[in-house]
Amino acid sequence: MQKYTSEARQLLALAIPVILAQVAQTAMGFVDTVMAGGYSATDMAAVAIGTSIWLPAILFGHGLLLALTPVIAQLNGSGRRERIAHQVRQGFWLAGFVSVLVMIVLWNAGYIIRSMHNIDPALADKAVGYLRALLWGAPGYLFFQVARNQCEGLAKTKPGMVMGFLGLLVNIPVNYIFIYGHFGMPELGGIGCGVATAAVYWVMFIAMLSYIKHARSMRDIRNEKGFGKPDSVVMKRLIQLGLPIALALFFEVTLFAVVALLVSPLGIVDVAGHQIALNFSSLMFVLPMSLAAAVTIRVGYRLGQGSTLGAQTAARTGLGVGICMAVVTAIFTVTLRKHIALLYNDNPEVVALAAQLMLLAAVYQISDSIQVIGSGILRGYKDTRSIFFITFTAYWVLGLPSGYILALTDLVVDRMGPAGFWMGFIIGLTSAAVLMMLRMRYLQRQPSAIILQRAAR
């Protein structure tokens, strides 16, 4: 029991800064929305539309670079720290190549925006302008993620938290300058949010790079031979590990976007109730997601040490802590669901629907916690392909079709409306949780030599 208690303390020490970093990131989006809304409703809508396109594109790159964390954790655990600098350099090359692709996609996103049904031309122009300002921050964001993944792979999660809050503090005044046109800058409205956020991502990257350069604990990792050329072998391996994670993230984000589109014709009350429940459950998701990042670090480190039993302990402890957290958040959600809904809206119909959907959200929080921590465990074992196949099958083959049938057809029961889609979420997430656990059990039952050989690749 003592080993699990000790492991839980180490996991929480890693996870809490990640949680706070995610809070800072979420707060940046909130600040952008509020400040753009203070300028005009059209600008706020433009920021919302632009963000809905920015997120899938940038999260694809973010997911690709997550491969660095288990690689660095494993090298650190095995005492091969001299190889980490080369992996990080290749991470920067990969981030640079992906940035170009993301920027091209975002520059041409106007075709998608203007094809939206009945969109106001002025709104479309502002959304395109916002994206074309924001896209210059894509390299800064992805380079920051490489530096952050280096730190987290070395079990240092506090720098990411500090840089997150630094970004938030810089974002507010820079937003003010570019939205309203102060200190000689042009008055850009919502487009100014894009300029400010792009600038903030570069500030966060430069600050993180400065920390790494001066940190005593990373002196042995610094590159003294220049930046070096791309290494096709290392980059290929990073892509093999990262691409399944990137695709899983992309399909998860697009799933919720598709459901939002399917709910939109059902009416204002249904859309508002769905959005409130989804927004709140997304906030709760920060806890298991951050714990999953910590589990990846611990599992990778233990495998680097050659301890498959230590990796099992880290995995089981992570699941136990995650389930306990999920039970607490589920009880909190059930108990205060009406009060929470009232924070968003005071329309009785909207509040009633949101409260009903939050009951379903409380049910799936446990499954969601298990599946996301399971994903973190599999990343630690460098078994990322299974993450993609499991999430794609659970969300798109099981969850979305069953949600559609329950919500919009009479095939099984009378049409359930938004609640049907939430039942689909429960089916999809529970399926993912079960499949993740089966895959984890299969991996852990393999001979230690095979597990360690996979981890050392």
UniProtKB/Swiss-Prot annotation:
Its main location: membrane. It holds the Pfam family MatE. Keywords: Antiport, Cell inner membrane, Cell membrane, Ion transport, Membrane, Sodium, Sodium transport, Transmembrane, Transmembrane helix, Transport. GO terms for molecular function: antiporter activity; xenobiotic transmembrane transporter activity. The chain crosses the membrane at residues 11-31, 53-73, 93-113, 127-147, 160-180, 188-208, 243-263, 276-296, 314-334, 350-370, 387-407, 418-438. GO terms for biological process: sodium ion transport; xenobiotic transmembrane transport. It is found in: Cell inner membrane. It is a multi-pass membrane protein. GO terms for cellular component: plasma membrane. It comes from the Bacteria. Belongs to the multi antimicrobial extrusion (MATE) (TC 2.A.66.1) family. MdtK subfamily. Multidrug efflux pump that functions probably as a Na(+)/drug antiporter. PANTHER family: FMN_FAD EXPORTER YEEO-RELATED (PTHR43298:SF2), MULTIDRUG RESISTANCE PROTEIN NORM-RELATED (PTHR43298). This is Multidrug resistance protein MdtK.
